Amino acid sequence: ESPENTYLSSKLKYYLYYRALNEVFTFAKEYGKSKGMDVKCYVPTHSLVNYSQWQIVSPEASLASLPCVDGYIAQVWTGTSREPNFFDGRKRERVFETAYLEYGSMESMTAPTGRKMFFLTDPIEDWPRDWADYKKNYQATFTAQLLYPNIADYEVMPWPERIYEGLYRTSANSDKKERIPRFYSTQM
């Protein structure tokens, strides 16, 4: 895979995603209007911090130019925030710090537009871990989002069936799996 092909394919994905959102959101709003409803359309997206870490091209910032976009859902959670990064010459996971930067980049992107922003956190993540790890990192991302007083809308449980019905390891050193522990489900 050449750098030129990577660039061109990323440029194509950017264009197709931008166009698809414009068409789908415009249709949803027009259809809603024909039924007497004011349909709001929000883009669920990771932060530009995360996309740069994962080397993904996104039209995220350009979406502000689309009148059909009412705002964003900032998809920040352990899976994005635990991506190792460099600080003071050392590469390691910094979940709280990275989450804080991710939420900040999302707030900064929308603040000038006046559009609505939802901050998302997820009590688990896509990679198989244990309940103690999920809880520790969930609390780090949850705390990071609360440090943005201008944001008052949250998506706190994006996939409830995955959280409450999923089986995950009881500890890092065990293969035993259980549903969410009582102490953690109460916190949710």
Predicted features along the sequence, with ranges:
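Active-site neighborhood of glycoside hydrolase catalytic domains
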Residues: 2-41
